[in-house]
Structure formats: C-alpha cells, structure tokens
C-alpha cells in the first residue's frame, strides 16, 4: 500500500489532481469559518445542545450549520435538485430524452439542476432564516434582513456547487461527494473529543467507551461489506460468424449491487420527517405543536416511520434507476442470455425477482444504518456524537469510489495500484 501511495507522486497528472483537490478543500474549510452577518451566535449554538436532527445536518455541513457560516446549508439543495431531476427523468419525456442524449443531454440536465439548486437553496435559506427570526436569533428582525441572509446562504451553496464541479473537472473523484466526505471527516475529531470529555466528567465509564469503539469498528466492516456486496448473474454470449471470423462465445456477469440506492432513501425519508418540525416553526397552533412533538428526532413514532419510509424509498429509487426491461432487450440484441433463462421477457422477470430479493437486504440495512445513532446512544449512553451509519456509508462509499478512480489512473501508467 505504501508503495502504491508513493507512485502517486510519480504520476504528474495524478499529483496535480490531488493538489488541486486539496486546495479546493482548503477553500471549503475556510468558508466554514466565515459567519453570516446579523445572527446571534449564542442562540444558534443552543439549537445543537440537545442532540437532535440539527446535529446530523451539521455533521453533513462539516460544522458550518452550528457556526451558521456562509456554507451553513452545505450542498444539500444541489443534492435535492439532482434527486428531483432523476425522478423527473423517469416520468417526463423531455428529461428522459436528455438522459439518453449523451454529452449534450448531460449538459442540459446539469444546467437545469443548477437553476433548481438556486431555487431550492433560496427556499430552504428563507425558511431557515425565518425560523431563526421566530427564535430571536437575528440581530435585525426586519423582513429585508431575512431576505439578505437568505441571499448570502444561497450564494454560499452556489459557491460550494461550483467548487464541487471544479473538483470533478480538474481534481480527483466526484466533487460534490468529496465535499460531503470532507465535512463528515472534519467532524470526527470533535466526536472523539466529546467522548473524552464524557469520560473526564464521569458521564460514561471506560466500558461504555470501549463498547462504542467496538460498535464503530463493526459498523465500518459492515458498511464496507454491504457497499461492495453484489449478486453476479452469469451471462453467456452466443457465437456469431461474420464473414470468416467468429465473434462472441465468451462469458461475463451482470453485477447487481445489494445497496443500489445508496444513501438517497435516507435523504428522502429525512426530508419528509423534517416537515412537521419545520411547519411547527411557522404555525404556532397548539394541535400543530402537539403533532410535531411526536415527530421529534428519536421518538418511537419517528423512528418507526423513518424505517418504513426508508424501506419504501429504497425499492422506489431502485425501480426508477434500473430499467430492467431495457437491460434484457439490450442483452438479447447483442446475443447475450442467462443460462437456463430464455431471452427477452423471461430474462427481465428473472432479473426483477433477484433484484427484489437483494434490495430487501439493502433496504433493511439502510433502515438499520439510519436508526443506529439512537441505538448507540441507548447502549453506550453517548449522546450528541453523530458517529452514525449514514455518515459511515457516505465516507466509505466516497473513499472506495475515489480509490477506484486513482487505481485506474495509476494502472494506465503501468503502476501497481491500490486494489488487489
């Protein structure tokens, strides 16, 4: 592994990409420490003392939300816009045509996604700022102050979107994913320090700290296993004679990932369950406040609904992201078939059955990952440390994808890579 790392310094292109990515990370981390003007910092900090959903959102923002910096919303509006575009691509003919139109189509989708990011970002920023005004967190409670702060937050998200796109174009890995990755990794030392403080004041004992460490290591192993897990369906290609040459006749496989949906179902479910609490910030009606209290982060009702929504969205997103019928038709056109299964519709039905079974495993895994912070808090007594499976899932997934990209760049220059 050390020799492989040293090989990076020998590849000029790869070295430049790594340096560029690190420079963009520095810009990102500097922006986290630039506060939004006109906000009471002490009031903002009080929102993060109870270990609620705000803490999880702050984890993804790399600590920018608790500081209420210009990057407080992180890249969330861009992610939401991208997800919406993916969903629309399955139901809107124009977007579906763009997705099949190669590079030009991708440029059009990217352009619409950027516009969607600005719109969603301003809506989210306005809602967040308006809620802070209701909590007396603004120095100036005028409507113009709310608009100004909303514009600053939206501009911060747009800057992050630009940084992510620049990393993708000139750096290494997927820029948007790496921004989230950097934000989560940057908060890990804070989590370790919090556990140390708990030990110092006697909130937890050494046994609980060791138990937490064991659970953390076990989760890392489990997340890596599930992220890399796949069901390989064997595919055989028939031999074809063209002129005097024979083509085909080789074997391959169709990889079906256990966790095809990634963390998107968790994002969907979180967004829906955040709505009652958000509504309660604006509607000061007793029954609305009562209903919202049942959806507070960590309550039994919220936990059950969270798991159910994740199961639903895992199947939903997997269904729209993989067109099994087109897959079977393309396989048939190129002379491919699954041994023992007839080409065409029987192949599509078989793949659908297999996909349904392995998606169930992935769905339960995601649900377990999502409610893990509550379970860890109950077992170890450690609250407010967001060492959750969701964060691990993102960190492991991004790290593996980036390593594979580095691997391909190294191997093209005949260097020994990372992956054995």
Question: How would you label these PLM feature ranges?
Answer:
Residues 1-99, 104-420:
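N-terminal cationic and glycine-rich segments that engage phosphates or anionic surfaces
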């Amino acid at each position: 592994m050390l020799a492989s790392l040293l090989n990076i310094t020998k590849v000029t292109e790869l070295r430049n990409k790594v340096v560029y990515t690190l420079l963009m990370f520095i810009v990102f981390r500097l922006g986290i420490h630039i506060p939004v003007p006109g906000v009471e910092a002490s009031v903002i900090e009080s929102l993060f003392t109870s270990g609620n959903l705000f803490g999880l959102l702050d984890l993804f923002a790399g600590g920018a939300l608790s500081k209420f910096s210009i990057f407080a919303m992180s890249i969330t509006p861009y992610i939401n816009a991208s997800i919406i575009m993916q969903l629309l691509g399955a139901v809107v003919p124009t977007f579906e045509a763009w997705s099949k139109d190669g590079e030009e189509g991708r440029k059009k989708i990217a352009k619409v996604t950027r516009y969607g990011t600005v719109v969603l970002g301003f809506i989210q920023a306005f809602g967040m700022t308006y809620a802070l005004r209701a909590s007396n967190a603004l120095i100036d409670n005028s409507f113009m102050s709310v608009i100004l702060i909303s514009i600053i937050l939206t501009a911060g998200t747009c800057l992050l979107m630009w940084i992510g796109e620049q990393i993708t174009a000139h750096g290494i890995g997927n820029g948007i994913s790496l921004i989230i990755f950097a934000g989560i990794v940057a908060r890990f030392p804070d989590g370790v320090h919090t556990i140390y403080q708990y030990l110092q004041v006697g909130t937890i004992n050494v046994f609980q700290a060791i138990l937490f460490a064991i659970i953390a290591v076990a989760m890392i192993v489990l997340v890596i296993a599930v992220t890399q897990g796949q069901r390989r369906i064997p595919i055989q290609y028939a031999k074809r004679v063209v002129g005097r040459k024979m083509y085909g006749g080789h074997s391959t496989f169709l990889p079906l990932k256990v966790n095809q949906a990634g963390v998107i179902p968790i994002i969907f479910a979180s967004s829906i369950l955040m709505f009652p609490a958000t509504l309660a910030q604006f509607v000061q009606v007793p029954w609305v406040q009562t209903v919202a209290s049942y959806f507070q982060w960590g309550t039994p009702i919220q936990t059950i609904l969270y798991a159910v929504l994740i199961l639903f969205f895992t199947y939903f997103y997997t269904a729209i992201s993989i067109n099994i019928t087109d897959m079977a038709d393309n396989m048939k056109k190129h002379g491919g078939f699954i041994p023992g299964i007839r080409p065409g519709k029987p192949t599509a039905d078989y793949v659908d059955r297999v996909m349904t079974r392995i998606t169930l495993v992935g769905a339960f895994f995601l649900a377990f990952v999502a409610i893990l912070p509550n379970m860890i808090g109950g077992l170890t007594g450690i609250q407010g440390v967001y060492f959750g499976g969701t964060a691990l899932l993102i960190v492991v997934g991004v790290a593996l994808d980036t390593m594979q990209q580095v691997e391909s760049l190294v191997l093209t220059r005949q260097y020994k890579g990372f992956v054995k």
